[in-house]
Amino acid sequence: MNMKKATIAATAGIAVTAFAAPTIASASTVVVEAGDTLWGIAQSKGTTVDAIKKANNLTTDKIVPGQKLQVNNEVAAAEKTEKSVSATWLNVRSGAGVDNSIITSIKGGTKVTVETTESNGWHKITYNDGKTGFVNGKYLTDKAVSTPVAPTQEVKKETTTQQAAPAAETKTEVKQTTQATTPAPKVAETKETPVVDQNATTHAVKSGDTIWALSVKYGVSVQDIMSWNNLSSSSIYVGQKLAIKQTANTATPKAEVKTEAPAAEKQAAPVVKENTNTNTATTEKKETATQQQTAPKAPTEAAKPAPAPSTNTNANKTNTNTNTNTNTNNTNTNTPSKNTNTNSNTNTNTNSNTNANQGSSNNNSNSSASAIIAEAQKHLGKAYSWGGNGPTTFDCSGYTKYVFAKAGISLPRTSGAQYASTTRISESQAKPGDLVFFDYGSGISHVGIYVGNGQMINAQDNGVKYDNIHGSGWGKYLVGFGRV
């Protein structure tokens, strides 16, 4: 009798345990096809990217066609997960996506609690003792241990406690976090909202400022800021006033075009005619009557050569040499004036057109580079996916191809083909808008867009972001630069 009771009690206990346990996910195998992403698979299977990565021991979001993945059809019971920030600074937004406003930025290494995971891979987190917001899950590490979801009543108590907290406690929190977090919002916000201070003409350097950060904030290049302020290096100091007016960059090219090309075109024709006609008038006395029939035109035009020396003085060096050679030919030989005029005009026009075209080429090059950098910055924070062509997700060469296409420039699809299609340049020659290439050991395998000062924007495992081309993980794979 006692054995029966024990058996019944044990069976009942097992039944109760089964009904009380969290929902057990049923696993299925998915074979990756071309174009698949972890996020897309997670959506179709009703699970999360983190769950797939944990089930398959994945450390990145990279997957390849033919790869088999174990995928849970149902997400396990809700749980809170403690994670750490892997980025140097991480923007916290009011909603799940880069289109939402930035609340603040938190420093790398900060521990946060993941409350929920959205379908696009973003997490709702709790940080700084109860504050909430949304971050891109790619910038969080999975080192912390998961903890069960707290009961609803306890969550309400925590919220109430924060709202009714005494002023003294609030002041203490501010003092403890001010030094660590004050510079963060400036750097993070200026990367994505550069138009805020666009009308400013100068900037007083504050603690934590860098030339690169200021270039992003005001929408100008690092080279422009250094040029406008006669800086020979990127070192700046607190209190220093820097010129950051963007329109100053367009003044110089226009002045060069106006002073070189038009001046040569206006002065070329009069100089040749005056010199040639003077020689004709000198020799007509020695020629036959047949030649003198053309002389009546000479007195009218011969009165003009007097100002010629001052006119030639204002011309550029190329025109002065041309006129001297023409006069020598006319003195020594009786070369017809038509031939002399033809040769002089040809030389002068060639020089003028060359100068004008060079100025135009420089303007077009600067305009294209600015358009490329502006377009590249629009996609900061977007997710990486193998084979991604944009505009929501990218891989490295898909990103560069998309950005350049928006600027009206066509690139091949792969990083290797893009490398082959560019002109090789040295790092000292590289300018913002050039491409920078890397080789992991099997040929060109990564490409980014150079923005100057040793920085690039690229689509990598952690999404579209800025990276130091000589930094850890990049410098040893750097191949070089290419110009389209």
Swiss-Prot record:
Q: Which residues form the signal peptide?
A: 1-27
Every SH3b domain range: 80-144
Name the top EC class: hydrolase
Q: Where's it mainly located?
A: other
Region named Disordered: 150-192, 254-367
Which residues belong to any copy of the LysM domain? Answer: 28-71, 201-244
Region (19 X 2 AA tandem repeats of T-N) residue ranges read 311-355
Q: Which InterPro entries match?
A: LysM_dom, LysM_dom_sf, NLP_P60_dom, Papain-like_cys_pep_sf, Peptidase_C40, SH3-like_bac-type
Q: What is its EC number?
A: 3.4.-.-
**An annotated Gene Ontology molecular function:** endopeptidase activity
What the entry says about domains is:
LysM domains are thought to be involved in peptidoglycan binding.
Q: What protein name does the entry list?
A: Probable endopeptidase p60
UniProt lineage: Bacteria, Bacillati, Bacillota, Bacilli, Bacillales
